[in-house]
């Protein structure tokens, strides 16, 4: 499948600093954030005009699920638009707090852990054909996903009893299973719960929950693009070396703690391989596969960065990727800060800087400041991101959903939507079932909109 439906779900961390004596719980802060949403959507679980889903998840974490996208740049643009949507809610909530005499600054963090050790996720979704052998997908993907943090981790300072140490991944310490149908209880690498949000006879939805939330657009592109490419190769029958891991959960932590990528991890049967070895194998297969594939400039970008990132890790010389890979950008920032102020990695100010890196508010968040200075590369344009706040992808089912929502809201009609259903809640209870996520034109939806 060269054209694939993809999406990203991101849970955001929330905190608030108060200017006066009154304090609010995280639940109350979250309710302030979503008050504007509830006022028009009558719920804290809504679909937006751009086709995305916005809701309040378990533990007072706002969650944004992008609409269905069929290209990497489109997906990164809509992922970034999600940050803008949440930023608007943040600004609105701060104004409400001020009007009610509760002065405070609200912070939304696109990260994966809080100071109490809780974890929240960034989930990638990929449409795969039902006819394929799902167990083979899991078997081949698992070693890839365990070692992918070498090129896609968001970076984290981990406080251990001995000392503070810089790790590749925020999520690695919180994964407890390889493949499972649960998402919160056991936190697997791949979630197997079968909810395709499409024609179940044709498709499955692969739900990857191991990845970090990335601030870097190029890292997001690399994270999703490499996974999509490996999926494409599996579907095409490409043969891979057997890197079945003896213990994926131990391996994912070992990889996260080794910035050189050279520490051997134990494979099934007593063999060993390093994260660099494993990633090199998948990269080599990808380069070979692309020789016989139609050219795609976006995939070319992914493979180019993949190769350069592996070269940088191998040489331990990150100059050629230090504006493109999240954990490298963050580590360089910390090193400059430590050198300037003569401080240890365990200093609380580094922990504050780590958090501020993930602050999504423009003009305040550290990553945004780095981006403005040209220290973090972009692949999106502001105009495209602004448009994506209100406009769905034009090449997928998301267009049908977004157009329907816009028309119903403008006509003042009561409606219900989910990923596959569009329904007018009038006497006729008219519903259109959209089972093909690739389809952006549908006469039934046109008629439903015209009937308003």
From Swiss-Prot:
Domain of life of the native organism: Bacteria
Pathway(s): Protein degradation; proteasomal Pup-dependent pathway; Protein modification; protein pupylation
Binding site for ATP: 53, 66, 419
Reactions listed under catalytic activity: ATP + [prokaryotic ubiquitin-like protein]-L-glutamate + [protein]-L-lysine = ADP + phosphate + N(6)-([prokaryotic ubiquitin-like protein]-gamma-L-glutamyl)-[protein]-L-lysine
InterPro entries given in the database record: Pup_ligase, Pup_ligase/deamidase
Keywords of the record: ATP-binding, Ligase, Magnesium, Metal-binding, Nucleotide-binding, Ubl conjugation pathway
EC number: 6.3.1.19
Binding site for Mg(2+): 9, 55, 63
Catalytic residues, chain numbering: 57 (proton acceptor)
Pfam families noted in UniProt: Pup_ligase (PF03136)
One MF annotation (Gene Ontology) recorded for this entry: ATP binding
Signal sequence range: none
PANTHER family: PUP DEAMIDASE/DEPUPYLASE, PUP--PROTEIN LIGASE
Entry-linked NCBIfam families: pupylate_PafA
Other remarks on this protein: The reaction mechanism probably proceeds via the activation of Pup by phosphorylation of its C-terminal glutamate, which is then subject to nucleophilic attack by the substrate lysine, resulting in an isopeptide bond and the release of phosphate as a good leaving group.
Family: Belongs to the Pup ligase/Pup deamidase family. Pup-conjugating enzyme subfamily.
Biological role stated in the UniProt entry: Catalyzes the covalent attachment of the prokaryotic ubiquitin-like protein modifier Pup to the proteasomal substrate proteins, thereby targeting them for proteasomal degradation. This tagging system is termed pupylation. The ligation reaction involves the side-chain carboxylate of the C-terminal glutamate of Pup and the side-chain amino group of a substrate lysine.
The name this protein goes by in its record: Pup--protein ligase
Originating organism: Nocardia farcinica (strain IFM 10152)
The gene coding this protein: pafA
